[in-house]
Amino acid sequence: MHQSGEATRPEGLKILVADDEANIRRILETRLSMQGHEVLMACNGAEALELFRGSEPDLVVLDVMMPELDGFAVVERIRAQSEVPIILLTALGDVADRITGLQLGADDYMVKPFSPKELEARIRCVMRRASTGQGGGVGAGGSAANVVVVGDLSVDFNRRQAFRADERIRLTGMEFSLLELLVSRSGEPFSRGEILKEVWGYTPERHVDTRVVDVHISRLRSKLEDDPANPELILTARGTGYLFQRIVDSVASEGP
């Protein structure tokens, strides 16, 4: 399962690749297998879902345009039950597709035609963020908790978990890493380019690249804010980017 300790490194992952183009499946299967990954191949969305449910992969790479079920439908159904990392493959001109996929819960996207090496780099970055993103950090008996509390929201950075009124908030590894970055410099803005580089590991080459940040901010607000349309925690810094509200005396240590 993607929660396992094996996800702390890029080697030895179980990766589900779904694409209706046989040449892309062949190239990715060859490249990823050579790196020691177990690669599961699907040629349509229905097959991808069946393989996902039966194999619990560590990572999913999905083409958007597939027969039977498109990539959007697959992302939506996976996200209803899992925070497994998802990378979408989209056509060059389909900016709207990229935004839709991110809104549904994809962690990142690659534009076709793409370099297999670049995809491998994206996989490494996404898996670093996901490796402890499911709460696999310090467990019972570990070091004192590093917890930030703001109102009824508490964020445990050791366990990489967030709670509102003692109810666990489901965050993907990328969403938690984004939250962690903003809180690390609360009250100070980050530009979209800074966030993209720190969390996703690459520098924006096109304006649309920074929409990855905007969409993830929107998803994070929908999970953390009482009123996402009028956020009080994750604020917009006009002309700059985003910031987390200034935190004062909100770090708690583990009680007796």
Sequence positions of predicted segments:
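Conserved acidic segment of CheY-like receiver
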Residues: 11-23, 28-32, 60
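Basic, amphipathic DNA-recognition helix from helix-turn-helix-like DNA-binding domains
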Residues: 76, 80, 85-149
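A structural micro-motif at secondary-structure boundaries
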Residues: 148-176, 189, 206, 243-256
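Short hydrophobic/Thr-rich beta-strand motif most characteristic of the beta2 strand and flanking loop
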Residues: 36-43, 51
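DNA-binding patch around the recognition helix
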Residues: 170, 215-217, 221-256
